[in-house]
From Swiss-Prot:
UniProt binding sites for Mg(2+) 2: E298, N300
Cofactor annotation remark: Binds 4 Mg(2+) or Mn(2+) ions per subunit.
Residue ranges of domain ATP-grasp in the record: 133-327, 671-861
Residues the entry annotates as binding Mn(2+) 3: Q820, E832
Pathway: Amino-acid biosynthesis; L-arginine biosynthesis; carbamoyl phosphate from bicarbonate: step 1/1; Pyrimidine metabolism; UMP biosynthesis via de novo pathway; (S)-dihydroorotate from bicarbonate: step 1/3
Catalytic activity entry: hydrogencarbonate + L-glutamine + 2 ATP + H2O = carbamoyl phosphate + L-glutamate + 2 ADP + phosphate + 2 H(+)
Region ranges (Allosteric domain): 930-1058
Protein name as annotated: Carbamoyl phosphate synthase large chain
GO BP term, pick one: glutamine metabolic process
Record keyword rRNA-binding present: no
Positions bound to ATP 2: R707, S746, I748, E752, G777, V778, H779, S780, Q820, E832
Species, as recorded: Streptococcus pneumoniae (strain 70585)
Length: 1058
């Protein structure tokens, strides 16, 4: 059927900020879909609140609205734009839920807007647990016995009839939020109570646990002519019971017989046909390893994390084709863009194995609950491609960037057998490494399979890896063993370790004996047809398929898996850099390991290498491609850390040179540079041990800020008030960098702001100054930032511009740099300089209309700012006010304290823009899901040093009609200043403490600050946790609460008697 001509204008809803469970895969899907619709000649209107994505770039859609994805704003845009149709299936759960809400409120009918792709009835049938159950019964597809409950008592009664363990799944939540496995009634009560609160329709499904079955996924496509196909099946290494987003996954599935595959394939296709889904869909199934019994677990009627993985694993562009199907095209009339000759009706065939391993945030959250279950906890993932399981698994391990280069963590050798087996049985994020250690200790695959329900096939592969380790150890320098190890994915570094030599010597030995990788193409058809995709992976075998072109090339290093502190913003800069390289006439090559992102879409660059970002893997590509140089400044800390070893190996680093990168990162060199340039910084010293640190702090005076050098995202950074806290920090945190010293700085409480600058070595362009709403001490990634600045005097802004120019020229910066300042009493101090693209690049690029990463790349390749038409100095500021606000994923991470401090905790960001500060703030709060009703109660529980300031806020809340509650000390302070607050107990006051008030819905906001003491109060932590779990707005910085007040005051009227 040809495409529809009765619709011209289509609105696409994006997925909003990045949170755990909904990450960059939707940026990738949404970007693909918008471009695919434009390609067919439709006018595309996009709504998304996330500035950090490629999707919200002007050229992706005809009109881009960076506005909150809420009923109020989406309706407003629908009325203004009047589209013919709405495509909600590419915006993750956010897009789907928004479509449901628009429909339920009658907006779609009123405006005559048609839903494309998946009908509402199908979304309902797949998402509503009751309707799903009915449909499966009609199709005679088996599902675990289950019951829908709306109260805790109903859940307990049903569990009594089927027996424990049971699984709780709240309806309409994302990434398993609020769900979990319950072994007994106590756990069931706790999880169901929380689940009912988090479900927008207050319902949960209680089902028999099928933990221990194999978890298999099918990624399927269907069009309006009822053509349907399987793009790819995937098998979880971990059995059912661990969220698929937190599982190691292999594609294609490895342990199923042909009969089982056909059985599950037929089930998946019959489900997508019954739901009449037009587009992509993901079916999750559980297969009994001991019989042909299976259950359908769930269906996602939309593009999902798994479809991004399936797209990258097969090269089959699901989102692009889903968009074409949504406008009426069928699979037998669309050409598969990979081969350029076959139709999209051909099911992909793979002649390689893909491994995906999730990336968890527990290196940032040491206190976090690491046990894995049905609720997702990973922030990102890596993918690796190989010719066998061993190769793809080991390549994926070294892609993770958690300090391992093999499937082993050396410290585990010291763990006792009992502790080891406990970690093997109770899965945590690092279970793979414990299982591998158990095999090294001689536990058999049979024993481990019995304990873990992991298929013995995979455990045999881990055993094979261990056998190769023993071979290597027994035969140093043996070329045959070396070849075997390389065929199975071993890194040079691991081989060097076993041989007691250096990585470099192993590399030399390989090169001398021509043991080098070949690069194979990902072509969707197992090389049956000719293919034109320049998408490659390395393996040690025959016939290299990646042919070097005659054109001069530039290699750009990506930023690897998404984690806290290094998010999609760096991918954004990478993609823009590639555009500029191509515009300058070079061939652009990307190397990256993250399957979720736009940079690993093969249509972005001239060549894509899907490889780990390690020195060895990068050098192999450089040896083959011989690029003009490598650009490292857009790949975050991942790429910057590779600059030095690459330069030592004789590779040309384009942009700021390694010696200058060092001057910005190395404390003593940096201090030296600032002295020479006559720029003040807070007084500080370096220390290599506890005594030195104590001495330094006495000299500088408390409070001090302590942190290791060379880290991203403020890892292990703390503000300490006294010597005892400092000593305890030195004992617990210095692990963070054994051969790097710790920095001890005077902690200045002042106004913080940051600048991104672009320099060509002579001139410096400063697109804008961003002012932080939270005072110094909150990590810049967790602060709300405002552009243009609202409170900085002209003099301060001029000083900032002057210091920025001096630093850029003085540090010989070529390309991007980011500088953070703190201002106290009109005096400007430099806190830190990062000689690379920072996480504010996409935000600032969008609000100033300067494509910063592209400009920086052009300068790196030799053009000057004046040639590109930019002035030296501060760019004229915008007339509108723009705010970047952080978004957190605390609901997913039990036991992580939500108190903001110098260590970064946010996973994503949103933007709010309007004519005034108050309106922009309102949008930013709405977009980041911080919604305050116009009346209700606010609780204050405040540290002594901030009571004075809090009193002023409480008065303002009272003036606009809020009730004020406060804990004992705070209430007494308020009363002594003439403000009566209703006293409320902290913790353990039966039903009069804050958590129980929160549970009863009597509190609308909590304002809680703590002193800077290291023994942060346990009570405070429980109060903050209860706010997070019940979705009550929580402010741990008074500045944020003050910003919220500005919004409320601007939206309310004051009523006073005359």
């Amino acid at each position: 059927m040809p495409k529809r001509t009765d619709i011209q204008k289509i609105m696409v809803i994006g997925s909003g900020p990045i949170i755990i469970g909904q990450a960059a895969e939707f940026d990738y899907a949404g970007t693909q879909a918008c471009l695919s619709l434009k390609e067919e000649g439709y006018e595309v209107v996009l709504v998304n609140s996330n500035p950090a994505t490629i999707m919200t770039d002007k050229e992706i859609a005809d009109k881009v609205y960076i506005e909150p994805i809420t009923l109020e704003f989406v309706t407003r845009i629908l009325r203004k734009e009047g589209p013919d149709a709405l495509l909600p299936t590419l915006g993750g759960q956010t897009g789907l839920n928004m479509a449901m809400e628009l429909s339920k409120n009658g907006i779609l009918d009123e405006l005559g807007v048609e839903l494309l792709g998946t009908k509402l009835s199908a979304i309902d049938q797949a998402e509503d647990r009751d309707l799903f159950k009915q449909l499966m019964e009609e199709l005679e597809q088996p599902i675990p016995e289950s019951e829908i409950v709306n109260t805790v008592e109903e859940a307990v009664a049903f569990a009594a009839t089927i027996g424990y363990p049971v699984i709780v799944r709240p309806a309409f939540t994302l990434g398993g939020t609020g769900g979990g496995m319950c072994a007994n009634e106590k756990e069931l009560r706790e999880i169901t109570e929380n689940g009912l609160k988090l479900s927008p329709v207050t319902q949960c499904l209680i089902e028999r646990s099928i933990a221990g079955f194999k978890e298999i996924e099918y990624e399927v496509m269907r069009d309006s002519a009822d053509n349907a196909l399987v793009v790819c099946n995937m098998e979880n290494f971990d059995p059912v019971g661990i969220h698929t987003g937190d599982s190691i996954v292999f594609a294609p599935a490895q342990t199923m017989s042909d009969y089982e595959n056909q059985m599950l394939r037929d089930a998946s296709l019959s489900i997508i046909r019954a739901l009449k889904i037009e587009g992509g869909c993901n079916v999750q199934l559980a297969l009994d390893p001991n019989s042909f019994k299976y259950y359908v677990i769930e269906v996602n009627p939309r593009v999902s994390r798994s479809s991004a993985l399936a797209s990258k694993a097969t090269g089959y562009p699901i989102a692009k084709l889903a968009a074409k199907i949504a406008v009426g095209l069928t699979l037998d009339e669309v050409i598969n863009p990979v081969t350029g000759s076959t139709y999209a009706m051909f099911e992909p065939a793979l002649d390689y194995v893909v491994a995906k391993i999730p990336r968890f945030p527990f290196d940032k959250f040491e206190k976090g609950e690491r046990r894995l279950g049905t609720q997702m906890k990973a922030t990102g993932e890596v993918m690796a491609i190989g010719r066998n399981i061993e190769e793809s698994l080991l390549k994926a391990c070294r892609s993770l960037e958690i300090g391992v280069h093999h499937n082993e963590i050396p410290e585990l050798a010291a763990v006792s057998d009992d502790a080891l087996i406990e970690k093997v049985v109770k899965a945590q994020d690092d279970r793979l490494f414990y299982v591998s250690e158990a095999i090294r200790r001689g536990y058999t695959p049979e024993e481990i399979a019995e304990l873990t329900k992991i298929d013995i096939f995979y455990l045999d592969k881990l055993l094979h890896i261990f056998e190769i380790e023993q071979e290597l150890g027994a035969h140093p320098q043996d070329l045959e063993v070396l070849k075997t190890a390389k065929l199975n994915g071993f890194s040079d570094r691991k081989i060097a370790e076993l041989w007691g030599t250096t990585d470099d010597q192993v590399r030399q030995l390989r090169l001398e004996n021509k043991i080098v990788p070949v690069y194979k193409m990902v072509d969707t058809c197992a090389a049956e047809f000719d293919s034109e995709t320049p998408y490659f992976y390395s393996t040690y075998g025959w016939e290299n398929e990646s042919i070097r072109s005659d054109k001069e090339s530039v290699l750009v290093l990506g930023s690897g898996p998404i984690r806290i502190g290094q998010g999609v913003e760096f991918d954004y800069a990478t993609v823009h850099s590639v555009k500029a390289i191509q515009a300058a006439g070079y061939e652009a090559i990307i190397m990256n390991s993250n399957p979720e992102t736009v940079s690993t879409d093969f249509s972005v660059s001239d060549k894509l290498y899907f490889e780990p970002l390690t020195f060895e893997d990068v050098m192999n590509v450089i040896d083959l491609e011989q690029p003009k140089g490598v650009i490292v400044q857009f790949g975050g800390q991942t790429a910057i850390n590779l600059a030095e070893p690459l330069a030592k190996a004789g590779v040309t680093i384009l942009g700021t040179q390694v010696a200058d990168l060092d001057r910005a990162e190395d404390r003593d060199l940096f201090e030296q540079a600032l002295k020479e340039l006559d720029i003040p910084q807070p007084p500080g010293q370096t220390a290599t041990n506890e005594e030195e640190a104590a001495l330094a702090a006495r000299k500088i005076g408390f409070p001090v800020l302590v942190r290791p050098s060379y880290v991203l995202g403020g890892r292990a950074m703390e503000i300490v008030e006294n010597e005892e806290d400092l000593r305890s920090y030195m004992r617990t945190a210095v692990k963070a960098s054994p051969d790097h010293p710790v920095l001890v700085d005077s902690y200045i409480v002042g106004q913080e702001c940051e600048v991104d600058a672009i320099s060509d070595g002579k001139d410096v362009l400063i697109p804008g100054i961003m002012e932080h709403i939270e005072r110094a001490g909150v990590h810049s990634g967790d602060s709300m930032a405002v552009y243009p600045p609202q409170t900085l005097s002209q003099k301060v802004q001029e000083t900032i511009a002057d210091y920025t120019k001096r630093l850029a020229i003085g540090l010989h910066c070529l390309g991007m740099m980011n500088i953070q300042f703190v201002i106290k009493d009109e005096k400007v101090y430099v806190i830190e300089v990062n000689p690379r693209a920072s996480r504010t690049v996409p935000f600032l690029s969008k609000v100033t209309n300067i494509p910063m990463a592209q400009v920086a790349t052009k300068l790196i390749l030799g053009q000057s700012l004046s040639e590109l038409g930019y002035q030296n100095g501060l760019y004229p500021e915008s007339t509108r006010v723009h705010i970047k606000a952080p978004v957190f994923s605390f609901t997913k991470l039990a036991k992580v304290d939500s108190l903001l401090g110098p260590e970064m905790k946010s996973t994503g960001e949103v933007m709010g823009s309007d004519a005034t500060l108050e309106k922009a703030l309102y949008k930013a709060f709405e977009a980041s899901y911080l919604h305050l009703p116009t009346f209700g109660n606010v609780v204050f529980t405040i540290a002594d040093d901030a009571k004075e300031e809090a009193l002023n806020l409480a008065r303002r809340f009272q003036n606009i009609g809020y009730g004020i509650l406060a804990t004992e000390g705070t209430a007494a302070f308020f009363a002594s200043h003439g403000l009566q607050a209703q006293p409320v107990g902290k913790i353990g006051d039966d039903d009069k403490d804050i958590p129980s008030f929160v549970r009863k819905g009597r509190i609308q906001a909590i304002i809680n600050t703590v002193g800077t003491k290291r023994t942060a109060d346990e009570d405070g932590e429980q109060i903050r946790r209860s706010a997070i779990e019940h979705g009550v707005p929580l402010f741990t910085a008074l500045d944020t609460a003050n910003a919220m007040l500005k919004v409320l005051e601007s939206r309310s009227f004051v009523t006073e008697a005359i």
